[in-house]
Amino acid sequence: MEFSPPLQRATLIQRYKRFLADVITPDGRELTLHCPNTGAMTGCATPGDTVWYSTSDNTKRKYPHTWELTQSQSGAFICVNTLWANRLTKEAILNESISELSGYSSLKSEVKYGAERSRIDFMLQADSRPDCYIEVKSVTLAENEQGYFPDAVTERGQKHLRELMSVAAEGQRAVIFFAVLHSAITRFSPARHIDEKYAQLLSEAQQRGVEILAYKAEISAEGMALKKSLPVTL
């Protein structure tokens, strides 16, 4: 996936009110960007980091500029726009870049499922194969090349794991897919130190037949694509 039109560069001054960030452009202009990430963004929003942003042609938007990527002061690229996790995963499935999810003839998005009536990110179907339910999570929290999810306690994420376990119990295929959107991450684990319950449920889910996949994106200011499978340690 290529960014079109190209992203523009600025330097982060501060992120605040969760959805806003002030930056300064190379020519000295101060802008306020929309921040499409409600998480803690630990390590992704340090003042002085390089920010790459897009600009909408919708003149009615109060904040037409959107923060897409962070380029940290150590050089790592991080996709902070959480919407890209699903877009990149869909693209990779359709391109059959994810070997574990290849060979299906139909892909549906936002399908209602489960006892708690959640919406699954993707459902894959093919003749003579069980349906495949895929829940996608964006991973940007990193420490010493170790990627973690979540970056804050997530009751919603816990619910999704319970739903996937119920799907697996019914004989369907259930997959939790971690889209790693941080160029410095080389391996993945649940963030037990942040959300112990989520880590416990993820281990239980694996024992009950839920598949756990982690794929890392190649990220630059020009574009992104999910390419590489990463090891997962529970």
UniProtKB/Swiss-Prot annotation:
Gene3D superfamilies: 2.40.50.580, 3.40.1350.60. GO terms for molecular function: DNA binding. Pfam families: SfsA, SfsA_N. Disruption phenotype: No visible phenotype. Residues 201-220 bind DNA. Keywords: DNA-binding. The keyword DNA-binding applies. One of its GO terms (biological process) is positive regulation of biosynthetic process. It comes from the Bacteria. Belongs to the SfsA family. Binds to DNA non-specifically. Could be a regulatory factor involved in maltose metabolism. HAMAP family: SfsA (MF_00095). This is Sugar fermentation stimulation protein A. It comes from Escherichia coli (strain K12). The lineage of its organism: Bacteria, Pseudomonadati, Pseudomonadota, Gammaproteobacteria, Enterobacterales.
